[in-house]
């Protein structure tokens, strides 16, 4: 399954790859083969990158799900104006090889939504949390508040987030993506217990990253 968030990119890539392949028809056999294979590789990568596999949460109930595929690179306590004091930050680094569709970590309503322009530092640099382009999202339910950010990286310079203020959202559902490598930082409130450690792998909408 392909994500609809990648349709325009796939269309442009298809046109570009087709042009390369057609051009190759006018070259000698060896060059022709190289160009056609290159076109196929480019198109194949585009389809593979924008894959969007179905996901089923590993647990339901009082859990917070991973908003992104990737690797946990930071778990630390910090205060935050949306989630309160002694909250916990969990940062997930998404490499270009990961599925890049993001999913809602907790059911509730969107109570905070703000886009921040910024730089494009490497996503594994923790300064990128505050200095890079990002979309901040806050969800509130009857039981808790969580806050998370889609952060652009050095390669990823396109955040997709169609969410709206006060929109009701459901845990595990798709809500956007970050194209070509990035990170997602999620802040969970005091009283929630992290279920992941640094170095652990996550799958969006499936891996439980915290319990409350």
From Swiss-Prot:
Q: Which residues carry this modification: Pyruvic acid (Ser)?
A: 182
For membrane topology, the record states:
Peripheral membrane protein
GO biological process entries: phosphatidylethanolamine biosynthetic process
- Signal peptide range: none
The record, for InterPro entries, names: PS_Dcarbxylase, PSD-A
* Listed GO MF terms: phosphatidylserine decarboxylase activity
* Superkingdom, taxonomy of origin: Bacteria
Instruction: Tell me what reaction this enzyme catalyses.
Output: a 1,2-diacyl-sn-glycero-3-phospho-L-serine + H(+) = a 1,2-diacyl-sn-glycero-3-phosphoethanolamine + CO2
Which cofactors must be present for this protein to function? pyruvate
Q: Where is the active site?
A: 182 (schiff-base intermediate with substrate)
Which Gene Ontology cellular-component terms appear in the entry?
plasma membrane
State which Enzyme Commission number(s) the record gives: 4.1.1.65
Residues carrying the site annotation Cleavage (non-hydrolytic): 181-182
All disulfide bonds of the chain are none
Pathway per its UniProt entry is:
Phospholipid metabolism; phosphatidylethanolamine biosynthesis; phosphatidylethanolamine from CDP-diacylglycerol: step 2/2
The subunit field of the Swiss-Prot or TrEMBL record says: Heterodimer of a large membrane-associated beta subunit and a small pyruvoyl-containing alpha subunit.
Stated role: Catalyzes the formation of phosphatidylethanolamine (PtdEtn) from phosphatidylserine (PtdSer).
Q: Tell me the protein family, please.
A: Belongs to the phosphatidylserine decarboxylase family. PSD-A subfamily.
Name of the protein in question: Phosphatidylserine decarboxylase proenzyme
Per the record, the gene is psd
